[in-house]
Swiss-Prot record:
The gene is yidC. One of its GO terms (molecular function) is membrane insertase activity. Interacts with the Sec translocase complex via SecD. Specifically interacts with transmembrane segments of nascent integral membrane proteins during membrane integration. This is Membrane protein insertase YidC. It holds the Pfam family YidC_periplas. It is found in: Cell inner membrane. It is a multi-pass membrane protein. Gene3D superfamilies: 2.70.98.90. The keyword tRNA processing does not apply. It comes from Burkholderia mallei (strain ATCC 23344). NCBIfam families: PRK01318.1-3, PRK01318.1-4, yidC_nterm, yidC_oxa1_cterm.
Length: 558
């Protein structure tokens, strides 16, 4: 029993330390395990940010424009010429900056269940405190890029009730004999935006430009539950290496590891619940870059070469821009691997089937809270044989605890004899001190996976359960579930054998309080899962202990 408690305490201590370290990092404090990265004020050059390869646009003609915030160089036309064109669809409200035809603001109006106004979230924004935008331009010469002021082509800016698509077009000034017409196509009910770049050669010589498509974001954190940490930063997906996450810290240290050339896949910016991604046409060769362009500003993008365009001719480059919630089924239908932006970490292989099952249950009951309850019940049923073995072992250990204490008292001055006597007792009573521990350890990956499923699923956002729980992604407003969690843990402690060590006994009594403090700040959906799991565990343990006790009494009577 002491061995089991030791293992459980190690698990508890490591979990507490990891949760605290995640809380430190999510609140901008240095990690306890990784050195703090000192940011420099040196703007990135035109390399791709992959220190290993060093392959990128070495020629000045192919260098990406250095202006990071969209502000024009001093030699260009005054900034007052740029305008913000407001638009609206059934899922978006946004603004396109005519400087570069940049998608500078994008508010998702139907995130979550779309019923509450406070569920709207602004994904792209361009203010003094926060920058996150999507932009495109041309490389390969003095061609139009995101620093040039475009002219809006006259047309509607709102999706009418009888329309399925809305198109917004912008024309660039002629530069280097080239004019660009950029068209955004919004489709009803879709978080995928079509972006078409038409390149017209109005000069007298052939041109060979490249189109760049990038996402620019600062490293400011998004709101996440306290004591939890979710990934924030760029990601690259290709057939070669599949899903590659890149931390801002790795970019700072020039240690970003990702595929730099491909003809498939996508690039993205990922945050809790939401993501954006450029998805170029499959089969089109492109270079991928991830780099730092300001002390706190980063970009991830692709550069796609265009075949030579003769004078008087034009070429079209089409791509898709996803900007929306990380809903797995929707993401799977947009592009291969895009569902991976919903980050489950190292437990993905278990978490994905669990979410699939949770989703199926939700489809049956129509409520995410009850789906969590039923999934927890189902998991407990599947693991009942393991739990039964654990509780039986605990019950047997509880029976021989007085004899163990007597042996400890008898041989307290001779640890070697005490251990030998304990081993003999285990052998005689056919008790395995690891018997109660191993079944619990086997179940831990599943419980951790379900934790990440509930933490990462945007479906919980704005999803009610019953009575006072109106949003499973937010903490319990009246702390009823955390209190129930503490009570259930206290009851479990009482059902377990009392540790022989008084200090250890006090620590076991302190555990419900320590965990409750953390659970006061956890999302209600997570706490609901743990409360239901604890209640079912108590019922299982009580039933098994009572059954064994009855069997032992009958055996003794006979």
């Amino acid at each position: 029993m002491d061995i089991k408690r030791t293992v459980l305490w190690v698990i508890f201590f490591m979990s507490a330390v990891m949760l605290f370290d995640n809380w430190q990092r999510s609140h901008g404090r240095p990690s306890m395990f990784f050195p703090n990265v000192t940011q420099t004020n040196t703007a990135s050059n035109a390399t791709n940010g992959n220190g290993a390869s060093g392959a990128s646009a070495a020629a000045a003609a192919n260098a990406l424009p250095a202006a990071a915030t969209g502000a024009a160089p001093a030699t260009t036309a005054p900034a007052a010429q740029a305008q913000l064109v407001r638009f609206s669809t059934d899922v978006y409200n946004g603004e396109i900056d005519t400087r570069g035809g940049t998608l500078a603001k994008l508010t998702l109006t139907k995130a979550g269940d779309g019923k509450q106004p406070d569920l709207s979230v602004t994904l792209f924004d361009h203010t003094a405190n926060h920058t996150y935008l999507a932009r495109t331009g041309l490389l390969g010469g003095d061609f139009p890029n995101h620093n040039d002021v475009y002219a809006q082509v006259a047309g509607p800016t709102s999706l009418a009730a009888d329309q399925n698509t809305l198109k917004l077009s912008f024309e660039s000034p002629v530069k280097g004999g080239v004019k660009v017409v950029k068209t955004y196509t919004f489709t009803r009910g879709s978080y995928v935006i079509g972006v078409d770049t038409k390149i017209e050669n109005v000069g007298a010589a052939p041109v060979t430009p490249s189109v760049y498509m990038e996402l620019v974001r600062d490293n400011s954190s998004v709101e996440t539950p306290m004591f939890s940490h979710t990934f924030l930063g760029p990601a690259v997906y290709t057939d070669q290496k599949h899903f590659q996450k890149i931390t801002f810290g790795d970019i700072d240290k020039n240690k970003a590891d990702y595929v730099t050339s491909a003809d498939n896949g996508w690039i993205a910016m990922v945050q809790h619940y939401f993501a954006s991604a450029w998805i170029p046409q499959s089969g089109a060769k492109r270079d991928i870059y991830v780099e730092k362009i300001d002390p706190t500003l980063y970009r991830v993008g692709v550069k796609q070469p265009v075949e030579a365009i003769a004078p008087g001719q034009s070429a079209d480059v089409s791509a898709r821009l996803f900007a929306g919630p990380e809903e797995e089924r929707m993401l799977e239908g947009i592009a291969p691997g895009l569902e991976l932006v919903k980050d489950y970490g190292w437990v993905t292989i278990i978490a994905k089937p669990l979410f699939w099952l949770l989703e199926k249950i939700h489809g049956f009951v129509g409520n995410w809270g009850w789906a969590i309850v039923l999934l927890t019940l189902l998991i407990k049923a599947v693991f009942f044989p393991l739990s039964a073995a654990s509780y039986k072992s605990m019950a047997r250990m509880k029976e021989i605890t007085p004899r163990m204490q007597a042996l400890r008292e008898r041989f307290k001055s001779d640890p070697q004899k005490m251990n030998a006597a304990l081993m003999e007792l285990y052998k005689t009573e056919k008790v395995n001190p690891f018997g109660g521990c191993l079944p619990v350890v086997i179940q831990i990956p599943v419980f951790i996976s379900l934790y990440w499923v509930l933490l990462a699923s945007v479906e919980m956002r704005g999803a009610p359960w019953v009575l006072w729980i109106h949003d499973l992604s937010q903490r319990d407003p009246y702390f009823i579930l955390p209190v129930l969690m503490a009570v259930s843990m206290f009851v479990q402690t009482k059902l377990n054998p009392t540790p022989p060590d008084p200090v250890q006994a006090k620590m076991m009594m302190f555990m419900p309080i320590a965990f409750s403090v953390m659970f006061f700040f956890f999302p209600a959906g997570l706490v609901l899962y743990y409360v239901v799991n604890n209640v079912l565990s108590i019922a299982q343990q009580y039933y098994i202990t009572r059954t064994l006790g009855g069997a032992a009494a009958k055996k003794k009577a006979s």
